[in-house]
Amino acid sequence: MKNLKTKQFQGLNGSLLLPGDKSISHRSIMVASISRGISRIKNFSNSTDCLSTLNAFLDLGVEIKKYGRDLIVYGSGLDAFKDPKKPLNMGNSGTTTRLLLGLLAGQSFNTCLVGDASLSKRPMYRVTNPITEVGGEFSLTGNGTLPITVIGHPSLKAFDYHLPIASAQVKSALIFSALQADEPSIIFEKEATRNHLEIMLNDFGADIKTNGLCITVMPRPKLSGRTISIPGDISSAAFFMVAASLLPNSCICLKKVGLNPTRIGIISVLKRMNANIEVKKTSNEAEAYGDIIVHSSNLHAVEITSKEIPNVIDELPILTLAASLAKGRTIISGAGELRVKETYRISVVAAELKKLGARIQEKSDGMVIDGCPKLQIPENNLATHGDHRIGMMLAVAALLVDTSKTITLNNPEAIKISYPNFFRDLDYLLNNPDMKG
């Protein structure tokens, strides 16, 4: 348990470097491992999830050396993995699991994937079904959850596949399978999703062409190791962006944050809500990054529709908090994807914020939120439910409760899944006078 800070009238102030983007960190190890030669990865995320990816590839025989936030990966190509001879532990990482289902489908050995209790409740059919359709094979439990054994087939066939849902993880798994096919493959997206893997693979020498929602993957590319600098994680930045918007007297600068167009939906939505946000782009690399400056503001309600959901899917918990204190009624729809996160996030976010007096109506694919002037003191402890993003959202929410009483958060350790130093960085911004607004 952790006692949360409350009643913060001085706001957040200062500059902060965010940890490396979690989505890019996962993919950087995978791409570096299937390339030939040495890759240097700078600002790798130290989140528990990304360390699960690191450990999985060590178990697959890849030589990786870690120096603080940087990695050196000695890649040997797509066909150089070694049979681990034991189950690969995915921890709590759905990204590691789903992407490995695609990558290992084309190997010459079988691999069993296991995970913790939370991950072992999450369905994997949404990945195994499409990969099975294109030639992969899996041995699953009756309900499609971990443990799963990937039956390796080193002769995968090319495919054309229409994704039934907007999911970057399913798309990425299919791309990894397509790299091991005998001919070019085509993937059709339902909605555009984060494209970090496509950008990175092309940077390493792959031939992947995107035309609207159509992605063509050429097989068996000659990938060469290179250096990657991972920008700050915008999904982690979102918690500070909302906190600074809601807390009076705030002025923060979040430095070198990733500004990939498929990830900046959080900025667009907050600006529509009347947030005072300025973005200063400082890099024009394939994965652009820049500084995000946020001042306090009075937020207004908005509507968030299914077309926006893929680009704010990880930020919906903290956006729900923002909507709970915004003027008017916010409607979120088309967010059924939240059913397959660490928790059923729609229900859990609504339940936890209702403890604080938020006015939320739960819908099958979203929420209706009526803004209230202030949050209340909860009668019971707040709980992360093992979900890192809910934990960080509740830590921000506690700052907005006008009380000298203690608010306690159960299972704060879950936050380490994506942001081990979250509370340290939050304390820094709460106690830093160098940019008083």
Swiss-Prot record:
Pathway the protein takes part in: Metabolic intermediate biosynthesis; chorismate biosynthesis; chorismate from D-erythrose 4-phosphate and phosphoenolpyruvate: step 6/7
Record keyword Plastid present: no
Catalytic activity: 3-phosphoshikimate + phosphoenolpyruvate = 5-O-(1-carboxyvinyl)-3-phosphoshikimate + phosphate
CDD domains named among the record's database cross-references: EPSP_synthase (cd01556)
GO biological process terms, semicolon-separated: amino acid biosynthetic process; aromatic amino acid family biosynthetic process; chorismate biosynthetic process
Alphabetic keyword roster: Amino-acid biosynthesis, Aromatic amino acid biosynthesis, Cytoplasm, Transferase
Main function: Catalyzes the transfer of the enolpyruvyl moiety of phosphoenolpyruvate (PEP) to the 5-hydroxyl of shikimate-3-phosphate (S3P) to produce enolpyruvyl shikimate-3-phosphate and inorganic phosphate.
Family according to the record: Belongs to the EPSP synthase family.
Assembly description: Monomer.
Identification of the protein by name: 3-phosphoshikimate 1-carboxyvinyltransferase
Species, as recorded: Oenococcus oeni (strain ATCC BAA-331 / PSU-1)
